[in-house]
Structures are given as structure tokens and as C-alpha cells.
């Protein structure tokens, strides 16, 4: 336990909401097999998306039975939803999980088939107060040159600001950013 606590101080390990240990931000890009080029290329695009939408932006990579935040950008002011880099989140809820499910990268059974079809046809998933009360998000897939989903770009913030539909509110900007 003392070693794990020391590793937590250096961001090698972090604790989940349930108290379990998981990889921390210092190791996140290694464990996800993420190319440092993806994170480097995403940075300016994510900052522009924050400037355009005024909301928090995250980049997720599929890591086994969770999704891991591999990059995040926050607005300079206002109420934000922060996901620390290295955080592992469930694939049973949320707009990013829907994107992974829509493109058959995970078991999509938690989500209605018609919602997944909409994600595939529109290129955007949304979630309102699903993972956390008061939180809403919209997510879009990032494809590699072979047409495979390699990551998911998300915009998240207070549900009230993203009402009535996060996808309608930020979807156009989000899809454009995910294609860059």
C-alpha cells in the first residue's frame, strides 16, 4: 500500500471512484498503445474546440473493458467538468461509450440499437445525466487511415448549458474537430 501511495503521488497510479488502483496519467499513453503523435496532434484541435464551445474536451482511448482519458483541455473559466488524464471510465454509460459501441469495438448491449444506428449515421453520440447528474456530453469517433476508430473526442459540460441536445449544440464543431 505504501508503494502504491508513493506511485500515486507521482501520477503513475490513481484511484478509481470505487477505490481500486488504475494507471495514472504518467503511464496512460503507454498502456493504451497510443501514439504520442495522436496526443500531440490533438492538442491544438482540442484547445480550439474548447475556445469554440466553451466546454471541457476529452480524448478517450479504449483500454480493455474501460475507456481511458488520454488528453483533456478545460476552459479558462466557468463551471467545468474535469476528467483527469489517465482516468478510466465505464463503457456502460456516456456518449464516448456509445461511440465505441456503435462501431463494434465493445459489447454494445447496454445501448438501444436505434441509438447506435443514429451514432453511425450522424457521427455523433450524446448523453445527458447518464453517468452523473447534471452532466451532458457529445462524442465523435476519430478514424485512422484504414477507417478504424482509434479514439473518441468528447465535449462535456453542465447539462443545462448543453440543453436541449448536446449533439445539436456542439455536434457540428465536434465532428469537424474529430476529422482534422
Spans of features found by a protein language model:
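Amphipathic alpha-helical effector-binding/dimerization core
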Residues: 22-107
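Juxtadomain coupling helices with adjacent low-complexity linkers
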Residues: 108-117, 121-125, 133, 151-180
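N-terminal helix-turn-helix
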Residues: 1-36
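Short loop/turn motifs at secondary-structure junctions and domain boundaries
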Residues: 51, 129-135
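A short, hydrophobic, proline-anchored segment that marks a local hinge/packing element in signaling
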Residues: 138-145
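Short, ordered coil/turn segments that flank beta-strands lining enzyme active or ligand-binding pockets
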Residues: 17, 63, 145-146
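A structural signal for short hydrophobic beta-strand segments in well-ordered beta-sheet cores
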Residues: 13-14, 59-60, 142
Amino acid at each position: 500500500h505504501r508503494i502504491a501511495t508513493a506511485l500515486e503521488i507521482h501520477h503513475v497510479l490513481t484511484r478509481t471512484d470505487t477505490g481500486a488502483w488504475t494507471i495514472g496519467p504518467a503511464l496512460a499513453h503507454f498502456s493504451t498503445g497510443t501514439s504520442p503523435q495522436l496526443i500531440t496532434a490533438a492538442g491544438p484541435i482540442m484547445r480550439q474546440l474548447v475556445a469554440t464551445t466553451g466546454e471541457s474536451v476529452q480524448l478517450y482511448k479504449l483500454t480493455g473493458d474501460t475507456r481511458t482519458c488520454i488528453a483533456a483541455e478545460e476552459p479558462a473559466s466557468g463551471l467545468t467538468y474535469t476528467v483527469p488524464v489517465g482516468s478510466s471510465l465505464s463503457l456502460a454509460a456516456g456518449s464516448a461509450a456509445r461511440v465505441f459501441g456503435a462501431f463494434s469495438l465493445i459489447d454494445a448491449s447496454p445501448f438501444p440499437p436505434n441509438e447506435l444506428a443514429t451514432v453511425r449515421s450522424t457521427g455523433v453520440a450524446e448523453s445527458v445525466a447518464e453517468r452523473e447528474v447534471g452532466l451532458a456530453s457529445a462524442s465523435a469517433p476519430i478514424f485512422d487511415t484504414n477507417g478504424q476508430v482509434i479514439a473518441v473526442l468528447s465535449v462535456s459540460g453542465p447539462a443545462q448549458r448543453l440543453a436541449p441536445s448536446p449533439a445539436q449544440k456542439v455536434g457540428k464543431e465536434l465532428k469537424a474537430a474529430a476529422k482534422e
